[in-house]
């Protein structure tokens, strides 16, 4: 990948290095194997064509944040693409729990649960060439977000790559195929930003490449309609917490012009929770009281959820 020599090293996904991650055990189709020995077939549908669904899960104080919601979203996505996971929801939750437990993790950890359609007879996109059942992998790592992104905030760049309409590719589906988001992120990095802000097919603000995007105007919290972005669980939780705290929320279309004149901005995601945004397309935005309040509310929720 060709990146600018001045490319940013900061993102909402940035985390503190932890040597313990070199020794983690990875769940692969019912077995736990050392990270260095974890393997899947080169004929796996996820590798061949990005055919699969996934979830990111955060462990805080021995609890997986919004566990039921994540598992529900996983199964909804699998049904959408006619993928039989072959396990019940409880069995999937047990896989995640056991992966954390086998690695001695109780706090400050994050797991990526990945399920693909399985191995193919030949490398093509046709699901009729699948041999056997799905491939299920769970990677748990010690992950604590770096303080830098929270303290200085993120710099965003508005990408020319748009979020697609549902009749093209429904981005509310948490699929393995993320190429459009990756392209947008590369464009943003080469423009000197940390992450990409993306518009919907009609030119309204949609989301960032890996997080949901919010602004604050007149003390109210605004976010997109949700029609053209991933169905963020942290997003929905933050909206609920804001309403419970008496903060006005608005889900709907808004323009770049309205975003540029916002008082505050922030992004949400499973790993980073709430991360402030301090610059979009070179225009400064302050880290303000609404973002700080919501960050506190969400951290308290994650510690108890």
Identify the residue ranges that each predicted region occupies.
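Glycine- and Gly-Pro-enriched alpha-helical subdomains that act as flexible
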Residues: 197, 204-226, 231
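Conserved alpha/beta cores of soluble small-molecule-handling proteins
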Residues: 1-197, 201, 230, 235, ...
